[in-house]
Regions:
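Bacterial N-terminal signal peptides
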Residues: 7-14
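Terminal, low-structured helical/coil segments at or just beyond the last alpha-helical repeat
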Residues: 23-28, 284-323
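Short helix-capping/linker turns of helical repeat alpha-solenoids
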Residues: 30-31, 35, 47, 61-64, ...
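Hydrophobic face of amphipathic alpha-helices that form TPR/SEL1-like repeat modules
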Residues: 35-42, 54, 70-77, 106-113, ...
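Structural signature of tandem alpha-helical TPR/SEL1-like repeats
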Residues: 45-53, 82-91, 118-127, 154-163, ...
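TPR/TPR-like (Sel1-like) alpha-helical repeat modules
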Residues: 198, 267-290, 319
Length: 323
């Protein structure tokens, strides 16, 4: 986990520095480079307290925009402290003012969702534009969503698709997901389930968890072609395996409802175990009360027939997956 977090931060800082150097008129202070290096070394070793203090010194004393953005990540991801979205947004906004494109995008999200200020789609659009113009093309998709929904602007679904399409075409999985959602759930004037499926399939090739989930939903509701339950189940299970929480219940339900063994009239051992695994994960992670209630009801049915000797191993697998 620590290595993953460090790799993420390194990638973000590398990209941010590269783009910041290209933005005319931006003067990010390079002072305190030793403090920044110390902070990065501390974060790489998992010493969150030391890393935070070093970044804080660079952010406050040196007004270093990269350090300010890094502090935002600490509060956003809960690195060595409680997750605090509002404080994360305040640091992102400082870094955005210093010219960091990814911080400008994050600041747009903060204003769009009303995290540290009241919702303000116009201000959100301002930051999305700045980030996009600096090369963070995915920001165009967030700007597109404002046009698709008519929040702060007149609705323009065609323009929304035009804005998001280049980032999706260039291979951004988040942008591809946006395109899929626009075609599936956007303004009725541009909805196209076939196009939605195509974009989700492209994102799924890059192992985007949400893409598998939406493919399952489309296959589930596709009246033009009857998909086998096994095909649909595979989509939800793949999303669940990649820790996409909404997929836990769907995967568990499909295993629970699978065809029983014709000789015994019972679920196969594999289907029984997987139904227990995913439905249990749903009861731990889902935020939907009805979903949790349904999962618990199915679990009672499973526990009535599943050997008790399986429980310890299966519960251990659930705990490992949810870590």
């Amino acid at each position: 986990m620590k290595k993953a977090l460090w790799a993420l931060l390194c990638a973000v800082i590398f990209l941010s520095e590269a783009w910041a150097d290209k933005v005319s008129g931006v003067n990010i202070q390079r002072t305190g480079s030793l403090t920044m290096q110390d902070a990065q070394d501390a974060l790489a070793s998992g010493d969150y307290a030391k890393a935070f203090n070093q970044y804080h010194d660079a952010a406050v004393q040196g007004n270093n925009a990269l350090a300010q953005f890094s502090l935002g990540l600490f509060f956003q991801n809960g690195w060595g402290r409680e997750i605090d979205p509002a404080t994360a947004c305040r640091w992102f906004e400082k870094a955005a003012q210093g010219g960091i494109p990814v911080a400008q995008h994050s600041t747009g999200v903060c204003f769009d969702e009303g995290i540290h200020h009241a919702e303000n789609p116009v201000t959100a659009a301002h930051w999305f534009r700045k980030a996009a113009h600096a090369g963070h093309l995915y920001s165009y998709c967030h700007l597109a969503n404002l046009l698709m929904t008519g929040r702060g602007f007149s609705k323009n679904p065609v323009k929304a698709l035009e804005l998001c399409h280049p980032a999706a075409q260039q291979g951004s999985p988040p942008a591809q997901l946006w395109m899929g959602k626009f075609y599936l759930q956007g303004d009725p004037a541009i909805r196209n389930q076939r196009e939605a499926y195509r974009w989700f399939a492209v994102a799924a090739q890059k192992q985007a968890p949400e893409a598998f989930y939406y493919l399952g939903l489309i296959m589930q509701s596709d009246s033009s072609r009857k998909h086998a339950p096994k095909e649909i189940r595979q989509m939800f299970e793949q999303a669940a395996a990649l820790k996409y929480v909404p997929a836990y219940f769907q995967a568990g339900k499909y295993f629970h409802d699978a065809e029983p063994n014709p000789e015994t009239g019972q679920l196969s051992a594999e289907h029984l175990a997987k139904a227990y695994l995913w439905l249990s994960a749903a009861t731990h992670q889902s935020q939907d009360p009805e979903e949790i209630s349904a999962a618990k009801s199915m679990l009672q049915q499973i526990l009535a027939v599943m050997p008790k000797t399986w429980l310890a191993e299966l519960d251990q697998k659930i705990a490992q997956h949810l870590q």
